[in-house]
Amino acid sequence: MRHRKSGRQLNRNSSHRQAMFRNMAGSLVRHEIIKTTLPKAKELRRVVEPLITLAKTDSVANRRLAFARTRDNEIVAKLFNELGPRFASRAGGYTRILKCGFRAGDNAPMAYIELVDRPEAQAEAVAE
């Protein structure tokens, strides 16, 4: 029985899941919007939101924790230099999930996951 087991398996083993969400979190931080399946978007929210909360307090220890979770210095720099200050006054809820139909081929439910309060110029050019 799977009672009280949180998180989705997504038909992957744990190392594949960890690598996938590490890559997806980096893409979301870099582009501020990505298109993926709805279950992956819902699970990605559980990875990205704590990273942004961590970035609100700039310290060497927090930067090392963020690097341990993302393994990308460019992502860590953007988190602490741009996103942390941008969301300093927001107490959680940094992402938004927008459903966008179904994928051709397997009819999987698709969704955009984006960071709220994106700059307007970037909001118009939707990256997929």
Curated annotation (Swiss-Prot):
Cross-referenced InterPro entries: Ribosomal_bL17, Ribosomal_bL17_CS, Ribosomal_bL17_sf
Q: What GO annotations for molecular function exist for this entry?
A: structural constituent of ribosome
| Keywords annotated in UniProt | Ribonucleoprotein, Ribosomal protein
Regions that span the bilayer: none
Offer a single GO CC term for the protein.
cytosolic large ribosomal subunit
Q: Mention one GO biological process in which this protein takes part, according to its record.
A: translation
Tell me the protein family, please. Answer: Belongs to the bacterial ribosomal protein bL17 family.
Q: How does it assemble?
A: Part of the 50S ribosomal subunit. Contacts protein L32.
Q: Could you identify this protein by its name?
A: Large ribosomal subunit protein bL17
Q: Which organism is it from?
A: Erwinia tasmaniensis (strain DSM 17950 / CFBP 7177 / CIP 109463 / NCPPB 4357 / Et1/99)
